[in-house]
A protein has these predicted regions:
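Short, extreme N-terminal segment that most often corresponds to the first beta-strand
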Residues: 1-21
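Acidic, low-complexity intrinsically disordered segments
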Residues: 34-87
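Short, flexible N-terminal segments of the mature chain
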Residues: 14-41
Length: 87
């Protein structure tokens, strides 16, 4: 089971936050689906994700996206995904 804490940050403060849960084990191949589900729940655009985002999540249990990672305009400074199985 995976649990991902997703949050949008504005001026170093959490604006929106959810815990995303999925019964399957984490796989990098499914990262896009997790990202789409999380963004739909937060009602934000889906960012363009690169290999570096997946690699950072796998190696450090977190990753983040900034304005340049989005095609659409956003109303936050940073979008953070963090492993939440310990929460």
């Amino acid at each position: 089971m995976i649990r991902i804490w997703a949050k949008t940050i504005v001026e170093e403060k959490v604006q929106k936050s959810i815990i995303y849960e999925n019964s399957e084990n984490f796989t990098p191949e499914n990262f896009q689906q997790y990202l789409e589900d999380i963004c739909a729940k937060l009602d934000i655009p889906v960012p363009v994700y690169l290999t570096k985002h997946i690699r950072h999540y796998v190696n450090f249990n977190n990753t983040f996206f900034v304005e340049s990672d989005f095609v659409e305009s956003i109303d936050f400074d940073k979008f953070v995904l963090e492993e939440a199985s310990n929460y």
